[in-house]
Each structure stands twice: as structure tokens, then as C-alpha cells.
Amino acid sequence: VLGCMAQSLKHDLLENKPYVDIIIGPDSYRKLPEILNRENINNSIIDTSLSRFEAYNDLFPKRNNGVNAWVSIMRGCDKFCTFCIVPFTRGRERSRDLNGVLLEVQKAVDDGFSEITLLGQNVNSYKSKNNKFHNLLEEVSKINGLKRIRYTSPHPKDMSDEVINIMNKYDNICNSVHLPLQAGSNRILKRMNRTYTKEQFISLAQKIQNRLPNVGISTDIIVGFPGETNSDFEQTLEVMNAVKFDFAFNFKFSARRGTCLLYTSPSPRD
């Protein structure tokens, strides 16, 4: 069992899945050939250590016959939202080298792909040496033959004026922004550790709409977060009415074992 599932469910796998011989987390993949080449595996092999440095810099996926290529530019997250397991399964933030990203994008274009989606658990917190996300976005935009560029998922706290300016400057950057709100109540946002208020979020969304005419804005909403009241939910609706999102991904809260918040208030059922 490999990847995030191995990272988050290793104890359950050990206790209840005796047929599992190897449990490897997402940052231990380089050891896999050595492990598989062992003649005998008599005991379970487990390696779920997380690295502060592993950024998958030298791995270029093989792509065939497509339009959109997904290109990971960073891994992990430092935000520690209380509902999210990503920092515990993917580790802390680390970014790929800018030149490595550009080489992968260029190879995808050479292979016939016309659209690129830049990926990261917190994509706009990208930082490699002196380059930030807006620097990378601009360099990718200059690649000949690349018709469309998207990126996901950004964090509102890291959405900078520089990113908005670059989006406005280059026609091949799609005029759309995914801006996860999660909740519209400041009390719930604080419990979620989202590090912004609803007023700051509305101001950011309106700035994006003013500076990027006809921009499409989508969002994520969590409903039924522990302790959420009807009043809290009504405030979420107020933000949605103020911003007028083009699309919203709505999710009922579900607890993730191992997240940093020990919930003491029950999750609303209705």
C-alpha cells in the first residue's frame, strides 16, 4: 500500500490487513525498488517518514494523447486547517525547482498538450529560492505553444496582487480563480484556522472581480462543521450572495482521524 492512504491508515492496515506486506508513505517511494528486489519479505515493511526536502524534482511523468497536463509544483501544506489531514499525510510545504517545472511543461507542450494545470495543496504558496508563485506563473505563460494555463488549489491568504497582475497580463492564463471560502462565519473560520475573516475574503473576491473583468470564481464550502449554528450558516449564505460565485463545491463535514483539532462540539445533523 503506497501514498497518502499508507500514511494515514498505517496502524489500521497493520492491525486488520495481515495480507499487506509493504506500507510506504508518499515520501519514501525512492526506496521501493530496493524493497521489491529483496528475495524474502518475512515481516511487514513500513516506511511512512515525511521529508522536509523531497519535492519530486527529477520525476517527469510519461504522458500520451491528451489536451491537459497536470503538473505538480509543490507538495504539502503549512496552514494546518483544523479539518484537513493534508499536513499529516503530505508533510510540510516544499516546492520544486522553477527550471524543473518549466522543463516538464515544455516537454508536455512538445508532446502535444496545449493546456497545463499547475498543482499544489497550497499552490500559490510556491517558493523556490527567490521565485514565488507569480514568477513561476509568468515564466510558464511565456512558453510557446501553450494555449491555456490553470492552477489549483490556492489559499485566499496567499492570493497576491502580483498573481492577479500576471493573470491580467497574459491571455493564455484562464480567467478563472478557485477561491475556497469553507465558511462565512468569522467564529467558524477561526475554529477552522483559516487565517482570514469573511470581510477580508469578500474584499479579496471583489478585488479579483474588479481587476479581472468577467472572471469566473469558484469556491469550496463545508456545511455542518462542529459547533456551527444556524446563524453561522446564514453568514455563509451572506458571503455567497455578496460574491456571487460561478460555482461552489459543497461538502458535508466529515471528521478526519489525526487532524489537529479534537472536536468537542457535535456536528449539526440538519
Task: Identify the residue ranges that each predicted region occupies.
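Proteins enriched for Cys/Gly/acidic motifs involved in redox and nucleic-acid/cofactor modification
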Residues: 1-124, 177, 199-210, 234, ...
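Hydrophobic alpha-helix-in-membranes signature
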Residues: 86, 153-155, 225, 254, ...
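Conserved N-terminal phosphate-binding loop of PLP-dependent enzymes in the Aspartate aminotransferase
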Residues: 145, 244-245
